[in-house]
Swiss-Prot record:
Topological category with respect to the lipid bilayer: Lipid-anchor; GPI-anchor
Gene designation: LTPG21
Protein name in the entry: Non-specific lipid transfer protein GPI-anchored 21
Keywords annotated in UniProt: Cell membrane, Disulfide bond, Glycoprotein, GPI-anchor, Lipoprotein, Membrane, Signal
Phylogenetic classification of the source organism: Eukaryota, Viridiplantae, Streptophyta, Embryophyta, Tracheophyta
Biological role stated in the UniProt entry: Probable lipid transfer protein.
């Protein structure tokens, strides 16, 4: 372990043990990581802060032990959620299990996390049904009615009826007036008879 990682480890241990009661600190921050768990992963601080390219064997051994005894604490470590004052690189923390040959840890941490509630559909106010909109606006519904065509009267004209009743043509054509030639010839014959009768009377007188 080089001097840089030693100083970081010492700072981590000092921050955990600076209080008179480490248990009271854990109760206040409400974390599943106990002081012994955090002290066991002090060898990972160099890798988590970008001070080393690969995690040490002590770091990987501590991670493997946490997979069986403190999975919740391990999930906090790989997600950079440990409540300590050391600046942990989140990308390096997520890649730490794979670098130690434990690639399934991030998947197990996602499976153990509580699912977020599914958001419900957004409400934009009460929706009105088509029936309500039609009943509330009778004039608007009337505007969509088809225009009614005027009904044509099927009753024949009064003039046509009067013409057909007088013997005329039902289509309204009046019959031609009777010819006056028969009556004139009849009156002419009657005049001749009267003249002959008058002549006969005068002859006998």
């Amino acid at each position: 372990m080089n001097s840089n990682s030693f100083l970081i480890s010492a700072a981590l241990i000092f921050s955990l043990l600076s209080s008179n009661s480490p248990t009271s600190i854990l109760a206040q921050i409400n974390t599943p990581c106990s002081p012994s768990m955090l002290s066991s992963v002090t060898g990972c601080t160099s890798f988590l802060t970008g001070g080393g390219s690969f995690p040490t064997s002590d770091c990987c051994g501590a991670l493997k032990s946490l997979t069986g005894t403190g999975m919740d604490c391990l999930c906090l470590i790989v997600t950079a959620g440990v409540p300590i004052s050391i600046p942990i690189n989140r990308t390096l923390a997520i890649s730490l299990p794979r670098a130690c040959g434990i690639p399934g840890v991030p998947v197990q941490c996602k499976a153990s996390a509580a699912p977020l509630p599914t958001p419900g559909p957004a409400s934009f106010g009460p929706t009105t049904s088509p029936t309500d909109s039609q009943t509330s606006d009778p004039e608007g519904s009337a505007s969509f009615r088809p225009p009614t065509s005027p009904t044509t009267s099927q009753t024949p004209n009064d003039k046509d009826l009067s013409g057909s009743g007088n013997g005329g043509d039902p289509m309204g054509f009046a019959p031609p007036p009777p010819s006056s030639s028969p009556s004139s010839s009849h009156s002419l014959k009657l005049s001749y008879l009267l003249f002959a009768f008058a002549f006969t009377i005068i002859k006998f007188i």
